[in-house]
Amino acid sequence: MTLIHMNVLMAFSMSLVGLLMYRSHLMSALLCLEGMMLSLFTLAALTILNSHFTLANMMPIILLVFAACEAAIGLALLVMVSNTYGTDYVQSLNLLQC
C-alpha cells in the first residue's frame, strides 16, 4: 500500500471519527460527511488509475454527483432547521413533522 493510499484512508477514518464525535450539530456532521465523500472519491480515482480498469472510469464522477446531491439536501435541511428553531442541533430534526 502506497503512502497516498494510506493518507486517503487516514483522511476517511478521521472524518468518520469526527462524524461520531461531533454528531450533535448538523453543520459538523455535514462537514464530516463531505470529507468522507471526498476521500472516497480520491480513493476510487486512484484505484481505477492504478488498475487501468477503463470500464469503471465513470464511477468517481457518479460518486461526485451523489456527493453534490447529498450536500444540497443537507444544506437545505440545515437552513430549514436553523430558520425554524434557531439552532443546528440534530435533536431538532425529530421535531420536524409534516
UniProtKB/Swiss-Prot annotation:
Keywords: Electron transport, Membrane, Mitochondrion, Mitochondrion inner membrane, NAD, Respiratory chain, Translocase, Transmembrane, Transmembrane helix, Transport, Ubiquinone. It is found in: Mitochondrion inner membrane. One of its GO terms (biological process) is ATP synthesis coupled electron transport. GO terms for molecular function: NADH dehydrogenase (ubiquinone) activity. It comes from the Eukaryota. It is a multi-pass membrane protein. The keyword Transmembrane applies. Its EC number is 7.1.1.2. GO terms for cellular component: mitochondrial inner membrane; respiratory chain complex I. Belongs to the complex I subunit 4L family. Core subunit of the mitochondrial membrane respiratory chain NADH dehydrogenase (Complex I) which catalyzes electron transfer from NADH through the respiratory chain, using ubiquinone as an electron acceptor. Part of the enzyme membrane arm which is embedded in the lipid bilayer and involved in proton translocation. This is NADH-ubiquinone oxidoreductase chain 4L. It comes from Balaenoptera borealis. The gene is MT-ND4L.
